[in-house]
């Protein structure tokens, strides 16, 4: 090759390199320009007196005549009004901080009622997330109208809103004919199997069959048999108690009357030609029979943790339940019939089996079987669902308005397309920096919890060792579930919700049957079909969870947003009071009354000494007493035992976060004045994050069904046990925020 040719090639390559370098530099400039643009959206990098803020100041200062002297008078009056308030911080910290906000919300809700009875940050943001998800679905469908997935998404999204009444009545008639056929052919197990083949209905079946992880070997999925959930949340309403006063008797009579009216209304809607065959009183009477069977006492050896293992032979010979024939209803035969079944209550199982054999085919029971299906079927037609709402929503739960028609679609969508919604939400909302910040925070809180257990003085060495092992092995999972599989796409029909949901339910059942007795991993999102709400580990849920059977904390992506975490304009006190408190709460669930029954690997295992458990139970009794006493001051009576696990997690969780703040100030060498101000800010933010307006009519049901106590007591009770809080606000005996001890459990 000649010299001139080599020179030309070298020059060409050099030019090419320069061009490449220039392109890289230009791309970097563009990238940096984009970053700067994005950074300018960060409030900390914006001018305070930018145009939007100047407009805000003009509006805010209108009443002050733009005059600093007037503003000083305004502040002085505000402080004077606070001094005159009866709600002093040492008497009622929650009301002291939140009363003005609650009063404003009360007025707002009169004009603009919500479909959720607890108005707080969680519900407000969750509603926003639901609407975002629906928007992602609309965008996908618009761009992929002709694809199979696009058509399926559109069908599921619209099916409840566009439910065809003729098709719905056809399904109701089919149920009517199927149940009559089972009765005519004396096939009790066939009917029980029919009910258990559809999870939308099965939770009401007299005997409920599910395939779920074995509590003592959580990697393996096994058959479980349990009692049904009855139609009324408070079982005491079914019972005529001679001790009831006149007001209680009238309440029960009215509840029964409303319930029977609701049942009759359901039958009249779904069986327009046959509804006169059925009486609502029959459902009431049948549920009382079931309640009696559930409470019988024939078997003495009953496991306190609802874990009773029976073999196929024991089920059939000792309890008289034809397990082999029942399994054949699901095409499970021969050697595939499970030989290990976990029964939650041996007494309930035995007495319910006896009750079924005697009465399952009676007219009363036929009404109950029918109603089990119809009660759920009306919920999948938006127009019909108003019947359900008027009783369970408005009368029972105190809801002022029904779910918006558009929002209602989120439930069938999450049931059918959880993975799609998960991926779309992550695609639009991924927050790597916040994820890292929160991951570090929860790991730091875990470290503090471990140190607290190491310092613990009342746990014996063996119990302490197991507790530390559990905390050390506790896994933190962020953003998305560990296992996720693609959604199955069935042939859905746009105006037939019952067909769609039943088809999907059957598909899900078959997936569970395939893994019965195995250690195969499965990703099947969970829905509570009684409450009609998502209860699994969906990434688009605004919450955080501790799961005892995996000894893990899951923090969904939807929770990693304002107001729960604010890295733009808020400091450590705010973020600890919001996100930190939640994380400390979930960590503490690992050792609460329920979590403490599971070991480091997530298996049910008693690792406590009898002496330690006795001390722990005494602490639990003290917590129950405190929450009931604090509520009693406001004239509220409730049984705090039903939610004591949440109370324990609140008390322990808040103490963990307070200790985190202590270490934070120590590391940063804060002065005493700064420490004091920091703690005050933290306590105030902890009260603000718990603020909630709950509709007055919703309170009775909340006290009976919600494992969490009312937010006022979730705020005041844990704070009252903090020594630093009591010192800063000079809480003394006789003050409302005083409790006889400062025990934070661990």
Segments from the language model and where they lie:
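Compositionally biased low-complexity segments enriched in polar/charged residues
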Residues: 1-62, 66
């Amino acid at each position: 090759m000649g010299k001139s040719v080599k020179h030309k090639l070298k020059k060409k390559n050099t030019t090419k390199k320069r061009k490449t370098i220039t392109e890289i530099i230009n791309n970097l400039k563009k990238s940096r320009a984009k970053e700067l643009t994005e950074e300018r959206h960060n409030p900390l990098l914006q001018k305070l007196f930018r145009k939007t803020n100047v407009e805000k100041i003009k509006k805010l200062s209108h009443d002050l005549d733009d005059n600093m002297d007037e503003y000083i008078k305004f502040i002085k009056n505000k402080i004077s009004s606070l001094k005159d308030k009866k709600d002093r911080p040492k008497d009622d910290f929650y009301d002291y901080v939140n009363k003005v906000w609650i009063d404003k919300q009360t007025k707002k809700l009169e004009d603009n009622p919500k479909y959720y009875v607890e108005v707080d940050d969680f519900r407000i943001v969750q509603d926003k997330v639901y609407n975002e998800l629906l928007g992602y679905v609309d965008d996908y469908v618009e761009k992929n109208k002709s694809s199979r997935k696009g058509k399926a998404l559109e069908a599921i999204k619209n099916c409840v809103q566009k439910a065809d009444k003729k098709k719905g009545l056809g399904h109701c008639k089919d149920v009517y004919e199927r149940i009559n056929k089972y009765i005519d052919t004396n096939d009790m197990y066939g009917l029980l199997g029919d009910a258990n083949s559809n999870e939308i209905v099965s939770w009401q079946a007299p005997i409920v069959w599910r395939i779920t992880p074995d509590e003592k070997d959580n990697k393996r999925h096994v058959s479980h048999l349990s009692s049904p959930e009855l139609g009324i949340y408070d079982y005491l309403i079914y019972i005529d108690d001679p001790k009831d006063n006149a007001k209680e008797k009238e309440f029960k009579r009215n509840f029964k009357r409303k319930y029977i009216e609701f049942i009759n209304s359901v039958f009249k809607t779904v069986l327009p030609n046959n509804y006169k065959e059925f009486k609502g009183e029959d459902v009431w009477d049948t549920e009382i029979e079931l309640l009696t069977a559930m409470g019988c006492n024939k078997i003495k050896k009953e496991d306190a943790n609802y874990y009773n293992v029976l073999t196929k032979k024991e089920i059939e010979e000792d309890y008289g339940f034809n397990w082999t024939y029942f399994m054949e209803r699901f095409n499970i035969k021969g050697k595939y019939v499970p030989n290990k079944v976990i029964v939650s209550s041996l007494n309930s199982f035995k007495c319910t089996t006896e009750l079924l054999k005697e009465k399952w085919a009676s007219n009363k029971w036929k009404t109950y079987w029918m109603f089990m299906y119809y009660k759920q079927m009306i919920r999948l037609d938006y127009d019909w669902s108003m019947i359900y709402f008027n009783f369970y929503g408005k009368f029972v739960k105190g809801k002022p308005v029904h779910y918006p028609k558009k929002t209602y679609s989120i439930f069938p969508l999450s049931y059918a397309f959880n993975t799609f919604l998960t991926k779309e939400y992550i695609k639009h909302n991924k927050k790597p920096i916040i994820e890292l910040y929160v991951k570090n925070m929860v790991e730091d809180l875990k470290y503090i919890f471990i140190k607290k257990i190491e310092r613990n003085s009342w746990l014996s060495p063996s119990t302490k060792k197991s507790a530390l092992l559990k905390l050390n092995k506790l896994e933190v999972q962020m953003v998305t579930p560990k296992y996720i599989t693609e959604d199955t796409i069935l042939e859905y029909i746009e105006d037939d919700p019952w067909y769609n949901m039943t088809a999907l339910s059957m598909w899900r059942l078959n997936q569970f049957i395939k893994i019965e007795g195995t250690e195969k991993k499965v990703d099947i999102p969970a829905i509570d079909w009684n409450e009609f709400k998502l209860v699994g580990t969906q990434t688009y849920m605004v919450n955080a969870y501790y799961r005892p059977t995996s000894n893990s904390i899951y923090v969904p992506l939807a929770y990693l947003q304002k107001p729960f975490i604010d890295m733009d304009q808020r400091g450590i006190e705010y973020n600890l009071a919001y996100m930190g408190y939640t994380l400390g709460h979930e960590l503490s669930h690992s050792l609460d009354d329920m979590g403490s029954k599971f070991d480091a690997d997530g298996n049910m295992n008693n690792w406590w000494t009898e002496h330690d458990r006795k001390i722990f139970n005494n602490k639990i009794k003290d917590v129950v007493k405190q929450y009931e006493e604090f509520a009693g001051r406001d004239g509220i009576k409730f049984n705090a035992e039903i939610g004591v696990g949440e109370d324990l997690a609140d008390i322990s969780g808040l103490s963990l976060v307070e200790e985190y703040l202590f270490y934070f100030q120590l590391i940063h060498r804060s002065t005493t004045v700064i420490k004091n101000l920091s703690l005050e800010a933290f306590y105030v933010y902890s009260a603000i994050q718990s603020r909630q307006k709950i509709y007055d009519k919703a309170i009775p049901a909340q006290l009976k069904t919600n494992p969490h106590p009312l937010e006022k007591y979730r705020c005041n009770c844990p704070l009252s046990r903090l020594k630093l809080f009591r010192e800063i606000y000079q809480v003394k005996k006789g003050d409302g925020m005083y409790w006889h001890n400062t025990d934070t459990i661990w």
